[in-house]
Regions:
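Active-site hotspot residues in diverse enzymes, especially metal/ion-binding acidic/histidine motifs
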Residues: 2-350
């Protein structure tokens, strides 16, 4: 027997059991009369096997109840069973939907606005392209790599919605075949764009990455996701998504090169979860690519963190001074109150 909040599915076997009890017939004797194994009869009574038309004819002979009665009962049971399973899935999905940032995503136009939980479930199933939301619990994007801060269990659904939107938007981007060597050869060009304005480097980045088989997409930040970016393979291209909430240049470029580090080091080609070592490796790639380790060490040894010296060093290595300032502040070489006029706030359009 299967039951949900509104439906109870009772197998024909329950009626067979009642008939046997009223006639004082054991399952063993009944199996012999039906010319079936005791195991099959047990499964039949408990609704674990289908009551076929052939079985219905045997029941008509043994119990004297018309075959059409049993066929109708079986048909009704299977219908009720399917309905109950759907209702149970809906109940489970309603719980999941209530934990997702649905209203925020509706305001962004990702899903249709509604207050009805059943409609939210329907819309979310279409958004995630799944028969039911429970599938999401066992289905992860293979080799997904993302940079998040303050991550918690409650952020998982927001991250899932953000990554799915990145995947959907990336399908609209025309890319060449994935070419990691091409990407490696383009790193210096990408780095040089740190001194450009967003309206210039956004277009250039998308073009450079498309030639490497990477679809670059910019998305709004979702509250609770704590995401700066995410990278994963979808079909025949790599999806690289970055948040576009107001952020400083140093955070933007570090996040971008962090994701590029995951791609170049092959972290997203595996079905295994991204581990701490992968994150450290991607961090090191971002740090060393933006500010070469040896040059940074020499700069630190001079122990002059004045505004002019930071600008001079930035000019020498060819990056925006705000990137150097951000790293000095993060590593506690200078207070966060120093030289913030060197920081540039990006407001990218998604």
């Amino acid at each position: 027997m299967l039951h949900s909040r509104d439906t109870i599915a009772i197998p024909p076997g329950a009626t067979i059991r009642e008939q046997l009890e009223s006639r004082k017939i054991s399952q063993k004797e009944f199996a012999q009369r039906m010319d079936m194994s005791e195991k099959h009869i047990s499964h039949l009574i408990n609704g674990k096997v289908e009551l076929t038309h052939e079985t219905a004819l045997r029941l008509e002979s043994v119990l004297g109840i018309p075959a059409r009665f049993w066929n109708n009962m079986e048909s009704l049971y299977r219908e009720q069973e399917a309905r109950a399973r759907e209702e149970l899935a809906l109940e489970h999905d309603e719980t999941m939907a209530s934990k997702m940032p649905y209203s925020e995503c509706a305001k962004l136009g990702w899903v249709q606005p509604t207050r009805k939980i059943a409609e939210k479930v329907h819309n979310l199933r279409r958004f995630f392209e799944v028969a039911n939301l429970k599938v999401l619990e066992d289905m992860q994007v293979p080799g997904i790599a993302y940079r998040a801060v303050g991550e918690s269990i409650s952020s998982a659904y927001a991250q899932a919605m953000w990554a799915q939107k990145a995947k959907l938007d990336a399908r609209e981007v025309q890319t060449d075949a994935i070419n990691i060597n091409q990407l490696k050869a383009s790193i210096s060009q990408v780095r040089a764009l740190t001194t450009s304005e967003p309206e210039d480097f956004c277009v250039e980045l998308k073009s450079l990455f498309a030639k490497c088989g990477i679809a670059l997409v910019f998305l709004p930040h979702l509250n609770g996701s704590f995401l700066h970016g995410a990278t994963f393979i979808d079909g025949n291209h790599i999806v690289l998504g970055l948040t576009v909430r107001g952020k400083y240049a140093d955070t933007f470029w570090f996040s971008l090169f962090h994701e590029l580090g995951h791609i170049i080091h092959g972290h997203i080609s595996s079905f295994a979860d991204i581990n701490e070592n992968n994150e450290l490796e991607a961090n090191y790639f971002a740090q060393n690519t933006l500010i070469p380790t040896e040059k940074y060490r020499e700069f630190l040894e001079r122990n002059d963190f004045s505004k002019g010296e930071i600008q001079y060093f930035a000019n020498i290595i060819g990056i925006a001074p705000g990137i150097i300032l951000g790293r000095l502040q993060k590593e506690n070489y200078i207070p966060y109150s120093w030289h913030n006029e060197l920081k540039v706030m990006y407001r990218l359009s998604d």
